[in-house]
Regions:
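Lumenal/extracellular ectodomains and adaptor appendage modules
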Residues: 2-186
């Protein structure tokens, strides 16, 4: 982002709910409360399918590429869905209308994850809550329902383009539910 530039919109609030299925399928529901600073024809959400994930091996940290297909995309104000090698581009709005001021959008989709084949036989569930939002996010709340009990000491959260920013998301575990909030605007 450029200093003094007015962004097209601000994410005032984003609620994300993910239900993790036994087979690794993620049922994702996102609710956006946006504030458009000037007229726009649509809101675009990029859903990534390809991940470049760091994995610690006996040779050190190596990066492996994974593909997690995204399916069943639905939205309350869906205009179009385009797919490419990186994922899905979802465009929302209203045909023939310009968006301005406060606007709400919801989207749901399914992500088929897979075993990431970690070297020490551990399992890792990896996903990105928000990608390619080149704007300010004032508040985010997430809730992830796991299919069974897990070790809460093995849950980590971070933000940043490469997941390199620590301590910006709160995280709490209650039974098989992981939840939290953004601690400062992004």
């Amino acid at each position: 982002r450029t200093a003094n530039a007015v962004e097209a919109y601000t994410v005032e609030n984003l609620d994300i709910t993910i239900q993790v299925q036994e087979d690794g399928k993620l049922l994702v529901f996102e609710e956006y409360d946006l504030n458009f600073n000037y007229y726009r024809s649509s809101f675009t959400r990029n859903i990534t399918s390809t991940y470049h994930i760091p994995v610690t091996t006996t040779q050190g940290v190596v990066y492996r590429d994974y593909y997690f297909p995204v399916r069943d995309i639905q939205g309350d104000r869906l205009l179009s869905v385009e797919r490419n090698e990186d994922g899905s581009i979802v465009t929302m709005g209203e045909e023939g209308m310009q968006l301005t001021g406060r606007q709400k959008f919801s989207i749901s989709y399914t992500v088929q994850t897979s075993d990431l084949q970690m070297p020490d036989q551990s399992q890792m569930l990896y996903w990105t809550l928000v990608t390619n939002l080149d704007t300010r996010v004032n508040h985010l709340h997430y809730e992830i329902e796991m299919p069974k009990a897990f070790d809460p000491q093995e849950v980590y959260t971070n933000t940043g383009k490469y997941g390199d920013v620590k301590n910006t998301l709160s995280m709490q575990v209650n039974g098989n539910i992981i939840s939290g909030d953004l601690l400062q605007p992004l």
